[in-house]
Amino acid sequence: MGRSPCCEKKNGLKKGPWTPEEDQKLIDYINIHGYGNWRTLPKNAGLQRCGKSCRLRWTNYLRPDIKRGRFSFEEEETIIQLHSIMGNKWSAIAARLPGRTDNEIKNYWNTHIRKRLLKMGIDPVTHTPRLDLLDISSILSSSIYNSSHHHHHHHQQHMNMSRLMMSDGNHQPLVNPEILKLATSLFSNQNHPNNTHENNTVNQTEVNQYQTGYNMPGNEELQSWFPIMDQFTNFQDLMPMKTTVQNSLSYDDDCSKSNFVLEPYYSDFASVLTTPSSSPTPLNSSSSTYINSSTCSTEDEKESYYSDNITNYSFDVNGFLQFQ
């Protein structure tokens, strides 16, 4: 036979939106007496409403513990888990979400969660993966945008997505792990060219900084090291007017070639100590100065190159120092 209606279809019962005066009457009565029996409450509270209307008004709008605002991720997880067990029993789901009403949960499910599950390839009715529903392009475009503009926010979304993949011990994972692997693979391939470009830029910057980072001592400092150099007026006769050492070895693309020029003036002695852009010139114990022109080469190439050129580009300073 079923349950009888909460109220008879009587003339004089008001329908439609509630007025502030009616809301206040309902609040005052429940605060004093409690809601008790919803069938008799309207008459006792002096309201021209049916019991169901009073119950819905109180439950969905007037009770003080109603939580307003957006649903948290934990609440979304709970709704999805409970819906997979109970289906569309919104009142039962709302009873397990403090502060949320069944009507609010139902509306949020239809406007947000259901659409999100469809984009993730999850059937919102059976909660099983369906590849024909998966919208990978939407997931990737959203992830790429968040990664380039809001890295921290994207990291939070990634953590939330990972939590959707994990089981809580009582239920199956909400999203098939294979779907996550596919989306992650595509997302990594999408980001790989950018990462490669950034790494190349950083490497080139480091090479440039290393090449220009070695500062050659100034002329005044060199003159203080070799104060007697100014006395040798015929010092230019001891060396060629201009010597160019050019490294012709072939290296990798990220290596550079060094050119060194000894200018025809030697009073400041700076040109004799010209150094390569990426490594300082060693001054050995026998006071012989070697001009080193290899950069970014292996040890074997350096040894071979030095053995061929060390006799050609060295001179003895001891002869000069004896005049002192």
UniProtKB/Swiss-Prot annotation:
GO terms for cellular component: nucleus. Its main location: nucleus. It is found in: Nucleus. It holds the Pfam family Myb_DNA-binding. Residues 38-62, 90-113 bind DNA. Keywords: DNA-binding, Nucleus, Repeat, Stress response, Transcription, Transcription regulation. Induction: Induced by salt stress. InterPro entries: Homeodomain-like_sf (IPR009057), Myb_dom (IPR017930), Myb_TF_plants (IPR015495), SANT/Myb (IPR001005). Residues 10-62, 63-117 form the HTH myb-type domain. Signal peptide: none annotated. CDD domains: SANT. One of its GO terms (biological process) is response to abscisic acid. Highly expressed in flowers and at lower levels in rosette leaves and cauline leaves. Expressed at low levels in roots, stems and siliques. GO terms for molecular function: DNA-binding transcription factor activity; transcription cis-regulatory region binding. Seeds over-expressing MYB74 display hypersensitivity to salt stress during seed germination. Probable transcription factor that may function in salt stress response. This is Transcription factor MYB74. It comes from Arabidopsis thaliana. The lineage of its organism: Eukaryota, Viridiplantae, Streptophyta, Embryophyta, Tracheophyta.
